[in-house]
């Protein structure tokens, strides 16, 4: 689903020469990872801002800018205000959101839905994980389109990403062993780990 989603929004994104990622809270940290992976795979400079700061520093945004707004709810007011500022300056806006039809999604040129479902816990683990997946897929696709990554690299990375669910299942099967190990390590005052 992510691969189809990124292709649907991809062609217009690849002609930009500057990228801004703007978000708040946990989504901001997904944006920081996005910066690293986009710069590495696409070779385009990326800036990441906390949404509340973006509007007040008069950022260099124009029609050659891709503005990525990341928001779990799609209703984060600071992110929405930053998105409006970027659009006013001519940027192409891509939102990475979880909630279909949210304000951020409606006001964006393109939307990449995370499909994380509702977040029950305070820790935004599902949303963060799916936002990271979106950032990786976006970077891979843009890198492929710009010729910065090869088709073999792209296909291999996609294969690895698709393996994540089975790797997680293997990990969770080891939960009893991990719990036992944690009980052993819990009272130690010092642990030395070497290769």
Question: How would you name each of these model-derived features?
Answer:
Residues 1-10, 15, 192-195:
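Single conserved hydrophobic/aromatic residue that forms the stacking wall/gate
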């Amino acid at each position: 689903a992510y691969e189809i989603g990124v292709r649907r929004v991809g062609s217009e994104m690849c002609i930009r020469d500057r990228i801004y990622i703007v978000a708040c809270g946990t989504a901001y940290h997904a944006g920081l990872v996005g910066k690293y992976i986009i710069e590495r795979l696409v070779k385009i400079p990326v800036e990441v801002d906390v949404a509340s700061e973006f509007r007040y520093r008069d950022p260099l945004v124009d029609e050659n800018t891709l503005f990525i707004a990341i928001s779990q709810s799609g209703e984060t007011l600071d992110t929405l205000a930053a998105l409006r500022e970027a659009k006013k300056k001519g940027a192409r806006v891509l939102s990475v959101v979880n909630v279909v039809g949210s304000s951020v999604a409606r006001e964006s040129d393109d939307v990449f839905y995370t499909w994380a479902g509702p977040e029950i816990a305070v820790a935004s683990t599902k949303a963060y994980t799916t936002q990271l997946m979106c950032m990786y897929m976006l970077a891979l696709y843009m890198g492929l389109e710009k010729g910065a990554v090869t088709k073999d690299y792209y296909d291999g990375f996609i294969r690895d990403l698709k393996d994540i669910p089975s790797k997680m299942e293997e990990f969770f099967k080891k939960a009893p062993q991990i719990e036992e190990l944690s009980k052993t390590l819990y009272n130690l005052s010092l642990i030395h780990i070497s290769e």
